Amino acid sequence: MEKFIAIATLASTNAYDRICIGYQSNNSTDTVNTLIEQNVPVTQTMELVETEKHPAYCNTDLGAPLELRDCKIEAVIYGNPKCDIHLKDQGWSYIVERPSAPEGMCYPGSVENLEELRFVFSSAASYKRIRLFDYSRWNVTRSGTSKACNASTGGQSFYRSINWLTKKEPDTYDFNEGAYVNNEDGDIIFLWGIHHPPDTKEQTTLYKNANTLSSVTTNTINRSFQPNIGPRPLVRGQQGRMDYYWGILKRGETLKIRTNGNLIAPEFGYLLKGESYGRIIQNEDIPIGNCNTKCQTYAGAINSSKPFQNASRHYMGECPKYVKKASLRLAVGLRNTPSVEPRGLFGAIAGFIEGGWSGMIDGWYGFHHSNSEGTGMAADQKSTQEAIDKITNKVNNIVDKMNREFEVVNHEFSEVEKRINMINDKIDDQIEDLWAYNAELLVLLENQKTLDEHDSNVKNLFDEVKRRLSANAIDAGNGCFDILHKCDNECMETIKNGTYDHKEYEEEAKLERSKINGVKLEENTTYKILSIYSTVAASLCLAILIAGGLILGMQNGSCRCMFCI
């Protein structure tokens, strides 16, 4: 009878007013990886890698791009007559060169240090064409032309920035010399060339002199040239060749030239101004767009606040960092599956909560209560906001930690330096792999911390409610408290908002607890009496068995008793 009373009384505790601590769950299928787990279900994630791009070359903060159209940049610089559209002064934030552009150096030959010239020219933000020399007073014939350099309108022509000087009729080409002083407010790129005829006949026809000497000097340049006469393979109808050169004339410096033949003389130079991104994008298909962007990649424009992108490793402006990863997902919500086992690197355990609540939509953590007035659910805004703030800080933290300037720049090398180019590409690839590994490791660590902090947040909220209730409630062991006094909705609200006064309900709770303890005491006494009776009965049975064994042994002689006096 006593045992029945105990069970009935304990069962009645289910009728107590109850408040439970829980967390949000939903039907999200998002998963994240952590340092120690793969594909962990979470309520919400944020993709950190931008994969979308607008396939266009857009204006940037430094201005519009310059599209070279049918021309290579060296053709623009030296003034290929089919590139006259670029003769006007122009500016750019970056340059777009089409790999299939047909117009390069029209008269066959090579440009010395072409890659460096491309870099120096493209690094400026604009140029202004400056006339350096007027050859009208020289005893030469000016403005030589070639059928290799036809103009857009048809007919023979020649480069617009350099002048092909030949002998003066009837048959004169003496030494001529000139000088130019750079009084502009910046550096000037100047250009010249040397003509190498295919035979002596053409040499004397053009320059009279079989042996010529040309010199170009500045404060830092002192070069002399003689023609290398001889036939070459026919290119663009020419067996002759031209070597093309360039230099930089700094402010206040003097450029001097002297020649008696074979000099393709400097006529116009380029006054470079400002700084651009210094990039020449080579792409065949992406058009110039009527658009603006903060981030321009070689593959298109990106407008994204994400910290990473995998569109292109070459980019300009305020861009996400490039990583060779298709996806890096950051947990910005809670673990979305119930768990009853310890987990995490930081010791937080929320396994005492049986599972999340799908009905909680206005917060991450909160309360569910039941009393005589019904049931209710409410979010705890304070703990939710603190968790959201931490998530925001995590995103900023990732951006800050990855905010070291890193990008792969196209390195252009001459034929002789192809091995250097190959080594450079391998180094770039290794750096990219390391960068991607660092980014992934950082995200894994932040995900681990987020989920562990979630466990800790639930535990902290549980402990805070436990402190508020003090001895006025019983821990039900599953994230819930059975309250040992009547607690209406107003009372429940005070527990949730932290204004609950446990002393106000202390007497009622003590009385209820004493009833529970009394029932437990009676139950314990009953069990103790039963234990004593059982022990005594077992001892008597054992004694009877031992005595019976002795008597049986003495009767059959197997056991003797000897008494010694």
Swiss-Prot record:
This is Hemagglutinin. Keywords: Clathrin- and caveolin-independent endocytosis of virus by host, Clathrin-mediated endocytosis of virus by host, Disulfide bond, Fusion of virus membrane with host endosomal membrane, Fusion of virus membrane with host membrane, Glycoprotein, Hemagglutinin, Host cell membrane, Host membrane, Host-virus interaction, Lipoprotein, Membrane, Palmitate, Signal, Transmembrane, Transmembrane helix, Viral attachment to host cell, Viral envelope protein, Viral penetration into host cytoplasm, Virion, Virus endocytosis by host, Virus entry into host cell. SUPFAM superfamilies: Influenza hemagglutinin (stalk), Viral protein domain. Binds to sialic acid-containing receptors on the cell surface, bringing about the attachment of the virus particle to the cell. This attachment induces virion internalization of about two third of the virus particles through clathrin-dependent endocytosis and about one third through a clathrin- and caveolin-independent pathway. Plays a major role in the determination of host range restriction and virulence. Class I viral fusion protein. The record marks 343-344 as: Cleavage. One of its GO terms (cellular component) is host cell plasma membrane. Residues 550-565 are cytoplasmic. A lipid is attached at residues 561, 564 (S-palmitoyl cysteine). Glycans are attached at residues 26-27, 139, 150, 222, 303, 310, 497, 524. Pfam families: Hemagglutinin. Residues 17-528 are extracellular. Residues 1-15 form the signal peptide. Disulfide bonds join 20-480, 58-291, 71-83, 106-149, 295-319, 487-491. It comes from the Viruses. Major glycoprotein, comprises over 80% of the envelope proteins present in virus particle.
